[in-house]
A protein has these predicted regions:
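Short alpha-helical interface patches
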Residues: 47-51, 55-62
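A short helix-loop-beta-strand connector motif used in the catalytic cores of GNAT acetyltransferases and
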Residues: 24-40, 52-56
Length: 136
């Protein structure tokens, strides 16, 4: 988990946090295998995590911007929690779209929050699309 914490250290918004705070923040997604580490030439360049929220947990996230430990895998509402990266954003987002569509199917709603300095400024959602799937 230290490699992910080191990745977070590239962003000023996390520099006021102790390593233990970041660990606490990402631990639920790690324990539930609701994350992906992204590599380029064997170097960690990105991290993505997500949650499956109940209606109640979704309401709390939308209003307060927090997810309780027990809520990370509590329902059928899919939330893209975060993607951080130091490079390869286009490839990481392509992987994310493909993975979401393979996992949930076409026409499913994916939600996320936009924040700035711990303040929620936009709720967003998108519907998965067939053209997000890679030919394999």
């Amino acid at each position: 988990m230290q490699d992910i914490i080191s990745l977070y250290r590239n962003y000023p918004k996390y520099n006021h946090l102790k390593d233990s705070d970041i660990k606490h923040y990402i631990r639920p997604s790690i324990l539930l295998n609701q994350y992906k580490k992204h590599y380029n030439n064997n170097k960690l360049v990105g991290f993505t995590n997500w949650a499956y929220l109940s209606d109640k947990a979704q309401d709390i996230l939308q209003n307060e911007g927090v997810i309780s430990y027990q809520d990370w895998n509590s329902g059928n509402n899919f939330w893209h929690i975060e993607t951080i990266c130091i490079s390869n954003l286009k490839d990481i987002m392509s992987w994310s779209k493909n993975n979401l569509t393979k996992t949930f199917g076409i026409g499913k709603i994916i939600k996320w929050l936009r924040t700035d300095n711990e303040t929620i400024y936009r709720h967003s959602q998108i519907t998965t699309k067939g053209n997000w799937l890679w030919v394999q």
